[in-house]
């Protein structure tokens, strides 16, 4: 079966004038090739906010997404980026602010370029490194470095204080 599903989809969230765009083709056969383009232009984070219910709320800032999705449905290959600038979120009633990062999807791995954030009335976190999407990747890179200083996350039942350097 060589059928494909052609898609050209734009989604407007709430009163937004900027859509989330998805266009390309999705094969019916899972081993055939994908060809999708996803452009978030700051609005895809609002979609995540809607689906995450009360556990995650995007408060402010800029989050932009551009993504090419190739490969197959069984093993997609992602090429693109997420840029986060001066953002703030509420995660389980913890305000995490001053979030800045560049996240690169480089075919078979994810690279985090200097993600920095602060917890309101608490410490900060810094994350950098790369992880493969699959257990084996061509680049060979698979290391994440996380440095936290008095980074506190609280929920109704827990209070985590993380002060560490993890390689």
Q: Where is each model-derived feature located?
A:
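Interface amphipathic segments
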Residues: 1-66, 74-166
